[in-house]
Structures are given as C-alpha cells and as structure tokens.
C-alpha cells in the first residue's frame, strides 16, 4: 500500500476519534454500580438435572439393587405400601420398577416430590442466601443439589484455578469416591443455601436407578421467610473462613465436625440401646413387644446382650467412611461369636461390621 494512502487512513481515523471525544464530553472517574459493590450473586446456568462430564454409571436394571417386602394395599389385605418403613427407603435407595407396590409405591424420591418454593436474597454477612417461601414440614424434600459431575482430577484442577483467582465461594459436593458435583457454573438455587452450625436441613445421598443423587431435606419444621441452611462440614482449602451463622454453639470456623471418639464394645451396645429407647418406643422383633432397654445398663450375661442385638435388627445406621462409598446400612443380624453386626448397604452388599471400631450413628 502506498505511504500516502496509509497516512490518509490514519488521518481519517484520527478525525473520527476526535469527533467521538467531543460527543462524550469531559472524562469522569469510573465507579462500579452500587449493586455490584454490595455483592452480586455469582452467575450460573440453571439446570434441573446433573450434567455428567465424567463417565456416568450404568442405569440399574429391574433385578438389580435391594428389595423390600412391601406390597400393594389391595382390599382386605394387611400388607403395607412402601413408606417410611420400606427397607429400600431406609437405605436411601429408591424402589425399582419391579416393586410389588406398583404405582402406589411412595418410595420414589426426586421423581414424585415437588421442589419447595424459595427465594434468593442478599444477607448482611453471608452473601447470597435462600429463604423459604412456604411452610415446610420436617422430613420433606426441598430441592435436589445439581451441577456438573466431575472426577477428582478435574475437581483438583478447578480448585487450584479458583484459588489462583482469589475466589472463596466453592460449590462442590462429593457424592462418591471419584465423583463430585460442581455447581459453580451450572446448578439451581440449592447452590445458594448457606451454612449453619445448627441447620434446619440436611443433605441426603440417594440411589435412584443406580445413579447417586443428592437431595436436601428438612430436619425440622421451617416457617415461611426462614433461612434455609445446612452444615457444610467444609473441608478446608486455603485460609480459614469465619462462620457468621450466629447459631447457639457456633464453631466460629467453617470446618469438618470433630469425629466421634472410638468407644469400647460394651459401651457401643449401651449407646445403641439408649438411642433405641428414645427412637423406637415399641419393638416388634421375635415376639418382643414394648421391651425397653435401660440406658447405661451393664451387660452382664449373654441373654441381656442378645436382647440388645435383637433390638438392633432393622435399625438404619450411618457410618463415617471417607474412603468408601458405603455409608448407610440396615442392621440385619448380630453374630455373638464375632460380636459383629451384619449390615446391608445401599448397594445391596452385606458386611460384618464391628461397631466398636466404627464412627457411626443411628439415622
């Protein structure tokens, strides 16, 4: 291109730029809008179901998984339709399509439960938050925690990138040993539920047709306008974060709860008996009806210990196993010789568990 042509073009662009400056007027200091200074909710793409960026588990076929003894409530029948006492439900596993209750089956979480009404708000100290827009009863399903399902390697890479950017809001929830739900970029309102050391909801891990999904359920009655919270049990990544939940007994820092101390075998039996006495007013097992066990009682003979072991049958327990996918189990049998309980887990596998060596609790 001739030099004269280049100069002509530059002069023309300069004239256009000068004209724009005259139209703009005097320069002013740039300030962010007030709504940005107060804290804008982090942008994300709304989704209804998890999006898998890793290999998705195969769907369960009709004959896979665990089964319950419930059956359809036909006229004149004393059978019970799947409900709170369904073995599948007690193990946080949905019934399969081969359930004898058919269309009457009530153990179809997520599929049959409607998301509760809730509203996104800005809090004074905790950024964005969620309040209930309707009354919620204890035990009711509130919302599913959804996002991108990634593996541990991808999770670690994303965490380091966020750390280098100085971000402090994490939306990660581990569902299995090598599978994490990341709601940073895609999710729903559940990502805005804040932490509390005394929460009114909890996360529950359910197996739906072979897929592990996370639901948020009310642990007590929640009033309209009340903040929804759950215990993050946050695994620290970087500097400590202060807790501003304001609950009685606040731990002051976001972090994992201290684990329960390991207890001796006899004490483990006593603890089971104590919790059973509070949660199971009547025991129907092997003909034993309303046979209570006193808390703190010393087990001096095998018959007394056997009574406790029989009363444990049918109880759902939660085991703290960071490196295992098997956390929830149904106690099915007690072996007096080995002093171990036979526990069936949500994937249908049965193990003999020494409860004196496990960190556990009754669900």
From Swiss-Prot:
Its EC number is 2.1.1.-. Gene3D superfamilies: SET domain. The keyword Nucleotidyltransferase does not apply. GO terms for cellular component: chromosome, centromeric region; endoplasmic reticulum; nucleus; plasmodesma. GO terms for biological process: methylation. It is found in: Nucleus; Chromosome, Centromere. Residues 116-233 form the SET domain. Residues 63-114 form the AWS domain. Disulfide bonds: none annotated. InterPro entries: ASHR3-like_SET, AWS_dom, Hist-Lys_N-MeTrfase_SET2_plant, Post-SET_dom, SET2_Histone-Lys_MeTrsfase, SET_dom, SET_dom_sf. CDD domains: SET_ASHR3-like, Tudor_Agenet_AtEML-like. Keywords: Centromere, Chromatin regulator, Chromosome, Methyltransferase, Nucleus, S-adenosyl-L-methionine, Transferase. Residues 239-255 form the Post-SET domain. One of its GO terms (molecular function) is protein-lysine N-methyltransferase activity. It catalyses: L-lysyl-[histone] + S-adenosyl-L-methionine = N(6)-methyl-L-lysyl-[histone] + S-adenosyl-L-homocysteine + H(+). PANTHER family: SET DOMAIN PROTEINS. Belongs to the class V-like SAM-binding methyltransferase superfamily. Histone-lysine methyltransferase family. SET2 subfamily. Histone methyltransferase. This is Histone-lysine N-methyltransferase ASHH3. The gene is ASHH3.
